[in-house]
Amino acid sequence: TAHQAGIQVIEITGDCYETALAVAKEAGIYNDGDLAIKDEDFQKMSDDEVKEIIHRLRVISRCSPNTKLRLVTLAQEIGKSVAMTGDGVNDSPALKQADVGFGMQDGSDVAKEAADIVLTDNNFASIVKGVELGRTFLHNIMMFLEFQLPINFVLLIFCAIYPVVAANAEFLAPVQI
């Protein structure tokens, strides 16, 4: 799940508060102790207040395009990497502002154009799977380098010292290159 991967999911929707909260609970986004607010309450908050609550925020209902853009911008200001999903014209400013914008295949052309990546299966779980694959790939590269660099360093030192020890040896023989 996104939570297990260390990804904080915030549902920003045009749905009414009750519907948004029910969807968030069913999807595992919202738990006890988390924060769900209406757009009108979000608009009344200062930027500093939003930055203080953003780690607990899980749902914003009746959301406007300006709220989506503001939330993305404020999350970036506190150092979060932000991915945004959207399928409507109203999502395009936030999709462009986000570090990674995910459009939906069945979404509007404007949203797909604003997005960095288009999810052809329209499935949020594809993002989590992509993050998992990316982290696995990075881990494998790091493990390869952790193994390969010391070996290559030792061989380089050996190639530099051997000609000094063996007086008649070439510095780098064709076989060594």
What are these regions (language model features)?
Residues 1-4, 16-27, 66-72, 88-98:
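Acidic, divalent-metal-coordinating active-site segment for phosphoryl/phosphodiester hydrolysis
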Residues 1-8, 177:
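Short intrinsically disordered, low-complexity coil segments enriched in acidic
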Residues 7, 79-81, 94:
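Exposed boundary/loop context
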Residues 8-11, 18, 33, 141:
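Alpha-helical substrate-recognition element adjacent to the catalytic core
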